[in-house]
Amino acid sequence: MLDIRRIKENPEEIKRLLRAKEVDCDEAVDRILELDQKRRELIASTEAKKAEQNKVSKQIPLLKKQGQDVAPIFQQMTELKNQIAENDSALTEVEAEYRTWMLSLPNLPDPDLKAGGKENNEPLRYYGEPHKFDFEPKHHVDLCTDLGLIDYERGTKLAGTGFWIYTGLGARLEWALLNYFMDCHLADGYEMVILPHMLEYKCGETAGQFPKFADEVYKIANPTDDRIHFMLPTAETALASIHRDEILKQSDLPHKMFAYTPCFRREAGSHRADERGMVRGHQFNKIEMFQVTLPEKSDEAFEELVTKAENLVKGLGFHFRTVKLAAGDCSASMARTYDIEIQIPSMNGYKEVSSVSNARDYQARRGNIRFRREETGKIEFVHTLNGSGLATSRIFPAMVEQNQRADGSIVVPEVLRKYLGGLEVIERK
C-alpha cells in the first residue's frame, strides 16, 4: 500500500511512476484523492457535531434548575445523534471504498529502473561459461525417466497434468538440493521457520498478491467455515504476515528468515513446447529467503540477498547471469527486482531460478508492520524483502541436463554428494 501523503503531495508523479510499470492507475489515484477528502470532511463534521452535542447537553441541568422547558434541547440532541449516526454510516462506506482503491495500487518502482516490460530488462553481470556438449544431449524428461528419478505418468494419474513423483535417487537428489540450500542459509545466520501450507485471505492481501491475483491460487472449500483459505503459492505470502499488526523493537531488526515449502500454483494458460516436464508445474519445492529491515538498511539487505542467491547457483556449477528487471516486469508488490537466470540445454535462452525483490514499505503498510525507533520513540514502517533461495523446479532439470554424460548417466554436483552418501554418478541400473 502506498503512503497517502505522498499521493496527495504529487499525484501526477505517482501516476507517471505507475505508468512506468505499464499500469494505468490514473482513475484510481483521482478517486483515492476524492475519497480521502470526503473522509476528512465526514470526520470533521462528526467531531463538530459531537462537540455541539456535548455543549448542548451541559445546558440541561441549568435549564431544569431555572424551571425552563428542556424538551427542545432533547429534540436537538436527538437530531445531532441521528446526524452523527448518518455520518458514521457514510464514513464506513467511504473508508471501505477508499481501502479497496488503495489496495488496488501497485508499488512504485525505484526511480533508477527503466520503464516498460521485459524487453527493457538489463543484464548486469555474467558468471562462468555456457555449458557445451560433444554429444547430442537428452531432455530432462527422458533422462529422469530412463534413470528412474521422476515418474511423470503416475504423477498425472494421482493429481492430473502438471504433477510428478520423485522416486528413488530422484527423491534423494531433490532432498539433497533442499538440504544444501538450507545449510547455506543456516550458516549465514538466517532463522529457519516451518509454515502452514494453508493460509487465510489476509496473508495474500498483505503480500500484495490479493485481490488482483486471487484467481491464480488454489482456494479451499470449507462448508463449516466462511473464511477464505488458499494453498500457499510461495512462502513469501506467509512470511510477509508473520509480523502483521505488530510493533517491533529496533533491536530485533533485521529479522532474517528462510522457509522450505511446497508451492501450489494454478499456472493457467498454455505452455510452450520447450516447457514440458518440470519447468512449469502446479506443485514444486522452494526455499524462500525473507528479511524485515530498517528502512535505511533495505538497500544493503537487497544486495545481501542477491549475493546469497548467486552463491547458491555458483555452488552447483552453473553459468548464470543477473538481470535488473525493468519497472513493468517487476511484480505488483515490488519496487525493485533482480533475477538470477541459468540456461537449461533443452530450452532456448535463459530461465529465471531466483527473483530477489525489495518491497520497501509497501507490504508493511498493507500488513501494518512497524517498529519503534530507539532514538526518538517514533513508530515507523519496516521494509520487507524476499528472494528465492532456491526453487528446485528449474534447478533440478538444469542440473540433470547439464551434468549428463554420453552414456546417459548423470554426475552429481560435488556440493550434493555428502547428502547422498558420497554418490558421484547416477547410472542406469
Question: What positions do the PLM features span?
Answer:
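TRNA-recognition modules of translation machinery and tRNA-sensing kinases, especially anticodon-binding
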Residues: 126-429
